[in-house]
Curated annotation (Swiss-Prot):
It comes from the Eukaryota. It is found in: Plastid, Chloroplast. Residues 583-1676 are annotated as: DNA-directed RNA polymerase subunit beta''. DNA-dependent RNA polymerase catalyzes the transcription of DNA into RNA using the four ribonucleoside triphosphates as substrates. The keyword Secreted does not apply. The gene is rpoC. This is DNA-directed RNA polymerase subunit beta'-beta''. GO terms for cellular component: chloroplast; DNA-directed RNA polymerase complex; mitochondrion. Binds 1 Mg(2+) ion per subunit. Its main location: plastid.
Amino acid sequence: MCDAIQIRLASPERIRSWAERVLPNGQVVGEVTKPETINYRTLKPEMDGLFCERIFGPVKDWECHCGKYKKVRYKGIVCERCGVEVTESKVRRHRMGYIDLAAVVSHVWYLKGPPSYLALFLNMSSSEVEQVIYFHSYVVLQSTTELVQPKQLLSEDELIILEERLANQPFQVGIGAQAIQYLLQQLDLDMEIRVLRNQLFHAKSSKREKLMKRLRILDNFASTGADPSWMILSVLPVIPPDLRPMVQLDGGRFATSDLNDLYRRVINRNNRLKRLQEILAPEIIIRNEKRMLQEAVDALMDNGRRGRSVVGANNRALKSLSHILEGKQGRFRQNLLGKRVDYSGRSVIVVGPELKLYQCGLPKEMALELFQPFVIQRLMAQGLANNMKAAKKIIQRKEAIVDQILHQVVKAHPVLLNRAPTLHRLGIQAFDPILVDGRAIQLHPLVCAAFNADFDGDQMAVHVPLSVEAQAEARLLMLSVNNFLSPATGDAIIMPSQDMVIGCYYLTANNPASQAKQSHYFADFEHVLMAFEQKQINLHTWVWVHVNNNLNIILERSALQEDWIQTRGESLFLKTTPGRIIFYQQAAYHVGFYNLTINKSHLKELVKTVYNLKGMACATQLADDLKQLGFHYATTCGLSLGIEDLRVAPSKQKIFQWAQQAIEKTEQLWQRAQITHVEKFHKVVDTWSEASETLKQEVVRYYEHTDPLNPVYMMAFSGARGNLSQVRQLVGMRGLMADPHGQLIDLPILSNFREGLTVTEYLISSYGARKGLVDTSLRTADSGYLTRRLVDVAQDVIIRQADCGTLRGIAVPVSKALIGRVLAQDVNEECKRNQLITADMLVALRDTKQVIVRSPLTCEALRCICQLCYGGNLAYGHMVDLAEAVGIIAAQSIGEPGTQLTMRTFHTGGVFTSAQTASVRATLDGVVTYEGRCKSTRTRYGQEAWLLETSTPLFLQNDGQQHRYDFQAGTVLLVKSGQRVKFNTLLAYLPTSTRFEKATKSVDAHNAGEVVFDQLKLEQNLVKKEGILWILSGQMLHLPAGSELLVSNEQQIKPAQVLAQSYLRSRAKGIVQIHTNQVELILDRLSFEVKEPFHFHSGDGQIIAEKFEHQTPTGGQVFHRNGQIWLVPAAIYEVSSQKDLVDIKHGQFILANQRSICGVKNELSGWVQLVKQNEVIKEIRIRPGIYLPKVKTNQLGFVQSHLLLSSYGINAYTRRFCYVENYEQGILISPVYVFAGVSPPKIVAKSRWLSLVMYQTCMFQHQQWVKSYKKVYLMRCQLQLKVAPQAPLNQVTVHKEKNRREWRLSYFSNIKLQAFQTIKWLVKNHQRVEADVPLALIQLVSAFNGIVRYHPMLNRLLVVSDQDVITYSIGKPHHFQIGDVIRIGDQISHGLVAKTSGFVIARDANQIQVRIAQGYFLSRETICYVKDGDLVNEGDHLASLVFEQVKTGDIIQGLPRIEEILEARKPKNSCELAQFDGVIQEQSLVSDDGRVQAIKGTLIVCEGTRVQAGEPLTDGAVNAHEWLQIHFNNAVPYRGMVEAARESFAKLQAKLLHQVQQVYKSQGVDIADKHIEVILRQMTSKVILDDPGDSDFLPGQLVYLNEIASYKHVIFHPVLLGITKAALNTESFISAASFQETTRILAQAAMEGQIDQLRGLKENVIMGRLIPAGTGAKYL
């Protein structure tokens, strides 16, 4: 086997050598010269064709083409008759051919990039090279004059002019691929590289990028030793015929690979070009043929890369060589990375509760088929069959012996079970098969979690490992009992669930209903169980039992020991139940006595403890015991769910009343304009969230005390199925729901599913439910794609060495997450460097806050990770083995939960759970003091608060007691310094790490009125000082446009008083027509009486009517002669199938109505004429007329009938003219119909501006055949309405009467009367008026008493009526002044409370008048759209409140977020980062050394704050690329290049690790840090060289940091690669090509002569080798 693979450009000679073979007679074969494939009669390949046996080898094993040699004994002989070598037919899979091209062509991969290699080599643009190759432009090859430069492009015209001008100064031009080949041959690569290096030294940054790219490609290419001109092909290889097969289908037709069609096109065009060159055809024809050949080769190489795709018979683009390689169905992914597996089967799975953990049930029928070869071998070995055929017959007869042998064969032979999708390695596990009846595979219930299987119709595949090695691997590594822990987290994945959990829960439950009146005491556990079996006590009866003093008793955390354990003398008594004793004896005896109700988490803890203490064998046995125990008692408890079990807590209504009252208070605060609309919304939402949470706790308490064995309660609280949220929805309330955009609907669903939802509630809840289902289907695909990218980026990360020797590490806080890590530094005597941290070691580290551990991120091993830096293997709990493929495990660990999360979206059905902000409360009564700088703000509920701008301690003091709270900047304080507070008072909200986004909420006017600002200050529409926007109510009246106001501002008005009036005037001279809601002014009208059968169109387009004339008796041929239309008749029938031609012959005479033609009865007598098209009969024409056989005449065409016919002795002929034509062996004289010709356009009616014009057109052209056997109209007459260009408008309406049509040119004025408007007509209907005459008077009339307010800019009138004023009789002197604000709920006097808010507008001694007002509180940064004093209408947009809201953390945001982080995408609206350490001063950052960075956006840090480099200064997401560069730039002066890169990478890695974990943790998913670290290592291990210094690398090259670290004078910068980019930039071109962009990767690899060292897994799988990991590693 090879150790490495190189890919390079092939020379023409090399291509020929692949195919050429010399026959014994000296003939050289290999060139394919014919486009034929197989002979259609013999079905054998054509010689020298695309399937030629002489070139590619015989079609049948050991048989030549002509059949002279048949049998293996002639092996190696070449037939002297047909030239075919007698050999195996499989040589047709690897023998190649070639096509010698008549003209060179370019390879499309190197022409059409990106990048275009031909353009880069020649230093031309890709479009210029394309123009030359496709014969659009000439290129100058050599020149002796300065007027034309080499490589200059010339058009045909330019070339002719230059040739004339420079006749004495010769220059050479070329065109096509030949010209490009010449230029490439002239290229001196070494010289070009030297020039480029020199240019690069002096180049500016703008040019450097292109120069570096060109230098990199030329330098790499030069090292391959290839010739650039080989990119132009003169010989085209033909791939072996078995890779482009042709197969015969059932119906005798053939199906062939698209490649054969593409090769055929190339060969046809090549042969045609050769012929044209031989006959010296004109240059233009040859050029065209060369271009077509170039296009044919392009299509073969990569169809559709340039121009339109070549399509096959069914209009489908043909699959070219490139398409065969790339994509999911391509060669790499379909056939090399994934193959169909022999010895496999699949079937539905069912549960096998009786199975052991390492067993599976295999259907006998399937086992017999899978293990048939083994059974046959045993039958033959035992002498029961002499050969395979006999053995197979025994099996088919199903003899008893077969069953026995099958049991023997299967007994010690493990099988692999796989469930798709295989998201992690636990998706394939090995089991010992147990033969079962039926056709379903039986699966152990405990392995379902690993397979993510359930029994609702899932299917699984079975694979049989054949070799001894494969069986050993299956048994030792893949057996289900060996996969006890999850590789992603290290937790047990074999876990009792569902029924098993319910059984254990029921067994150990506390049931008050089954308690005895007096206490029972027992001597030991056996006596208790004896009493239980004798039914003296039941499963849940409390008993006191004597126990050993050294028994480990595990109680509930909240339990008091004296309630459960009594000491009497030296004896110890335990209060427990028979159920808990059974659980101890059968399951928990390894750990201790669990004297509590067992739920899922207890079982998980028990299994993990046993695994850690006793090892895998014990844990496996325990798992099986728990399964048996759980299933038994799940059956015993007979759990069933009835509607009566869904009991609603009686306290529900009280909770709702409390919530309703709280919301009413909030509503009143809003109406009093003390909080904004958004603050009200937040308060309402949080009130309902709190109510929902309280109700949930009440439900729990209710079930716990009244019915602990309730099925719903048991399921949710044991962890068997469902959760508290679902129980709350069933028996509490559904709560708040989200709309399709993820925004909350503040109308909660108060009902639960037990009570049933109202229609409104059902509609609200349908949003979330649907969103969940849609999201699931959309995101599952995304998650699979993420896993694929992760696998590709990390597939070559393998543990290849024991220790890299690094001294670096990462700081990790002491927690359970440390288990499996290796210490990087000594901590104490027990914990030394390079020691693996175990659970026991954590105890020794408990006094340490954090430790430095080794990590994949800091490993200095090149192209791998060392054992110590990786640490423990989470799946086995010991140090990771050498050759472990940790990259794949990491990718699966991150990808698999992504899929799980997407699939789990819909289970809560869009129910909203509020994200509570962390808060701090007072721990004692006392006085608050603090000194930090803070600014005033408001909480999300509108409470007054203070935002800390600096980190500050807060002290709470009382009688010598003092508590200190350390608050960081961003904390919101709810108390002032010096304020006295009570115990448990809310002091502060802590800043959260939650991601916020800006949002707006519009404020609309609830009533019409006048705007008044109260303490509100604006700057350019932005609220700078918060305050209240009041709308003083009134009736809004809209003034008609152009109206005259009849009242003055502040005037008192009465009912029926006219306030304003306006006139409706005529726009032009015309007749008035009054309609219900509009008035029409008719400027012009035109009438037309319908005498003829015109078909009138209903639209008022230009063509308003049409009719048809000149009906023919049948179809025929139309001629235009002498201004007339002449028709030579013929009935024409279209032939659709061969049946139509039965009994019909050319020249036959057919009588009318005697027979049917093409399924239609023939109505015309005449002679049959059959019309062919492409040798196929398409039409039958019946030609009436006189046929004169054996007659010849010169008078063909149109002839006067009597002149012609009289000469042949025919007297009677009805038509004046006839048409003569040759027919069969004589002439046919056809009659001619003559019709009047087309008349010029004629005006049929006219008025001042309108006219009706008649147009005639013939529908058939001269000599056109009218294909019909029925009557046809020849002439179309159209009436067109024309409006004169000088008319004032062109809006025409049509009016119908019985026989008349009238068209009117009219103006329409809509009359839409608003409220309080009246209209008086000043003209009569149908009256003629002049221009600008008043037609009507529109008046605005008052309906009530009041005062007028007028706003001239808005054309609005406000009437403050009695309805807008409330009078309060106080009955005694008062303190109210005019202008005072009274708010709703204010006490005006004893027993008198304000019903609405308003302003005092009048007062006297005993009463006040208040004008009703609605207030809106506007916070800072609100955008206000109205000004003080404006008049607004109900529904007008007043302002937009700007606020921050939490981004919802559903995985629908989560998965794209993970993708965003791992793909290292640059955010759209990124924030501005501090480029260096410094202080904020006046919208800029100033460093200590005087550097200044101007800041463009809105600052999110306060003036005078000190910030570190890389900190965000403005709003937006952080751009990780920029962040990395800033940290690198700041570290370089102090740390040097390599250390600065490592340091900046380390900071970025920590940041990205935290971000990824944050997304997964928010969904409750655990992933070990080290898996994410492995992926991040791949993303942050490379740098881009700016100056290669003394290294052999090139500028702009991507290099491993660890590889470049040893060189001096190297200048580089670190780069963060997204996972896709990192996967494509791997060192293995085979791996990269099988991932994405196959053709680009292969083209680049060939240009650079890349060598694949076959280090990773993918490239070895593709090459068919053992993978260099696990048991396939070289050292094993």
